[in-house]
Amino acid sequence: MNESFHEAFSFCNITKNFGSLRANDNVSFSVLNGGIHGVVGENGAGKSTIMKMLYGMFPPDSGEIFFKGKKTKISVPETAIALGIGMVHQHFMLVPTLTVWQNIILGKEPSLWTL
């Protein structure tokens, strides 16, 4: 297999609750390095919650996150950034005076590996 298509990260049995509301229930998926991925679903399906957990904005209540095959804890965005994970927020969280590219790299420090 080509090195560029190895598993970059995976969510295993991730659950996230906000009080009595279960936003994500036992979610598992993997993302391959070098691919293009989309997260799609209805409003309220938990897409933003999944992305915010990957970016370290919310901790999962249960389950595990693996990065390059190793169990990892992404509890703050700085950890995600150090792993090469970036996030482009929805329109209301973008900086309107910046270009698309500048919004993408906002807060990004140079690294040897990116997702």
Can you say where each PLM-predicted feature lies in the sequence?
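Glycine-rich phosphate-binding loops of nucleotide-dependent enzymes
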Residues: 1-115
